[in-house]
């Protein structure tokens, strides 16, 4: 049963203080029972509202990120593959690379969990309040190519330069056209200038990326800065994917 004045409820709705509204009855009951003093009552309501706003903001950031799946380190099975550098990956979860404005490169064979780890890292960034974005490299390049065609390139590339951290998944999958190489150069240069990290996942080792660019000058200018200032993690071993397939049984 509600013990709250309807006029107060309406005022909280008008002020968009739904966090306070949702917990007001419980906080009033705590106060009447002597569990909270008057100042503690106000502080509790304030914390309830802050928690509600932070939760709503995180939900919005995760929606804008366009993840393939909501992946976190808590649901990643580090024991599935003894070859994974677990200590190095957990160190990345501390986000010191983010504070330093440094990028991360996760490379290795298909199915070892590179995309999961990348998304888990930016999920942690989002929980800390940063805007993040996930993109398949090929789809991003196709999107930017469309911008050249309809003269919306500047608007489209801002979607990838604006977030604090950008994941480029499946980087260096195939040879790039000159236009794709130029677009990557502009994107990576812009993010480097503003100190916004990238997280790249790739099936190729970074030293094998250079030959995928038609212009070696562009390749060296783009990749040297990126590779030499990034944390490079080799993720090797058996595929992680069979363990995630529905209906799989273990012996």
From Swiss-Prot:
One of its GO terms (molecular function) is ATP binding. One of its GO terms (cellular component) is plasma membrane. Keywords: ATP-binding, Nucleotide-binding, Transposable element. InterPro entries: AAA+_ATPase (IPR003593), DNAC/IstB-like (IPR028350), IstB (IPR047661), IstB_ATP-bd (IPR002611), P-loop_NTPase (IPR027417). One of its GO terms (biological process) is DNA replication. ATP binds at residues 108-115. The keyword ATP-binding applies. Was identified as a high-confidence drug target. Belongs to the IS21/IS1162 putative ATP-binding protein family. PANTHER family: ATP-BINDING PROTEIN RV3427C IN INSERTION SEQUENCE-RELATED (PTHR30050:SF4), CHROMOSOMAL REPLICATION INITIATOR PROTEIN DNAA (PTHR30050). This is Putative ATP-binding protein Rv3427c in insertion sequence.
């Amino acid at each position: 049963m509600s013990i709250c004045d309807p006029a107060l409820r309406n005022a909280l709705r008008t002020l968009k203080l739904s966090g306070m509204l949702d917990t007001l009855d419980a906080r009033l009951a705590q106060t009447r029972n002597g569990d909270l003093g008057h100042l503690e009552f106000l502080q509790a309501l304030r914390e309830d509202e802050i928690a509600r706003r932070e939760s709503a903001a995180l939900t919005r950031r995760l929606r804008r990120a366009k993840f393939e799946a909501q992946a976190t380190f808590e649901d990643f099975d580090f024991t599935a593959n003894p070859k994974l550098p677990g200590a190095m990956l957990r160190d990345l979860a501390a986000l010191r690379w983010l504070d330093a404005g440094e990028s991360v490169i996760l490379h290795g064979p298909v199915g070892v969990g590179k995309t999961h780890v990348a998304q888990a890292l930016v999920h942690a960034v989002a929980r800390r309040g940063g805007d993040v974005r996930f993109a398949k490299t090929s789809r991003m390049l196709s999107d930017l190519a469309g911008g050249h065609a309809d003269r919306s390139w500047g608007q489209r590339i801002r979607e990838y330069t604006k977030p604090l951290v950008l994941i480029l998944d499946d980087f260096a999958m195939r040879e790039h056209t000159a236009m794709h190489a130029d677009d990557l150069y502009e994107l990576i240069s812009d993010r480097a200038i503003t100190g916004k990290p990238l997280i790249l996942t790739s099936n190729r080792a970074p030293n094998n990326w250079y030959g995928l660019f038609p212009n070696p000058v562009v390749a060296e200018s783009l990749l040297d800065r990126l590779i030499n200032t990034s944390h490079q993690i080799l993720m090797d071993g058996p595929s992680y994917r069979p363990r995630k397939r529905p209906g799989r049984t273990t012996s």
